[in-house]
């Protein structure tokens, strides 16, 4: 993982991350821009399917963006890159970010969501399911936005391809 200036987050940065992952059939470059006014501290990443070779950036200051990536497990296995990230925010709440790049596009599509949870909460299967079965956004090559509560709003975009990009901006409402 890495931290960059929030204003620098864009599709060229994501493409660089995807290229670094090599010839993996299911992979995702994730960028989350912190414009919340506070600092975020990494709690953990939970993978329902797949893995990563990078470390979740520990701190994300205001006006900076975190870069992260996920990929299917190596070898001839039927897995995608599916999971959730959790960051503890300086306001005492937790930001959860769910991503899903499935193995089988005959049955599934790309999905993503972002939510603020009250208090401190680590990413786990329950957080993943809550975000997936709540009101997630499809990875449909379009921008989506909603209020997150706690004075914040989220706006994001996800590609529909198996080599996907997820870009999220968390700002003051």
From Swiss-Prot:
Location(s) in or outside the cell: Secreted; Nematocyst; Target cell membrane
Record-linked Pfam families: Anemone_cytotox (PF06369)
Keyword Secreted: yes
Lineage: Eukaryota, Metazoa, Cnidaria, Anthozoa, Hexacorallia
UniProt-annotated stretches for the region N-terminal region: 6-25
GO biological process: cytolysis in another organism; monoatomic cation transport; pore complex assembly
Family: Belongs to the actinoporin family. Sea anemone subfamily.
Protein name: DELTA-actitoxin-Oor1b
């Amino acid at each position: 993982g890495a931290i960059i200036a929030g204003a620098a987050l864009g599709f060229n940065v994501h493409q660089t991350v995807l290229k670094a992952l090599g010839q993996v059939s299911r992979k995702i470059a994730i960028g989350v821009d912190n414009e919340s006014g506070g600092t975020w501290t990494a709690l953990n990443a939970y993978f329902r399917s797949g893995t990563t070779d990078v470390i979740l950036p520990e701190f994300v200051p205001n006006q900076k963006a975190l870069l992260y990536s996920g990929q299917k497990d190596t070898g001839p296995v039927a897995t995608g890159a599916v999971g959730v990230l959790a960051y503890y925010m300086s306001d005492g709440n937790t930001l959860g970010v769910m991503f899903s790049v499935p193995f089988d596009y005959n049955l599934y599509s790309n999905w993503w969501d972002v939510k603020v949870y009250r208090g401190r909460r680590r990413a786990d299967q329950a957080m993943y399911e809550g975000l997936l079965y709540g009101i997630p956004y499809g990875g449909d090559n379009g921008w989506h936005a909603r209020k997150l509560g706690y004075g914040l709003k989220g706006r994001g975009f996800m590609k529909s391809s198996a080599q996907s990009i997820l870009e999220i901006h968390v700002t003051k409402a």
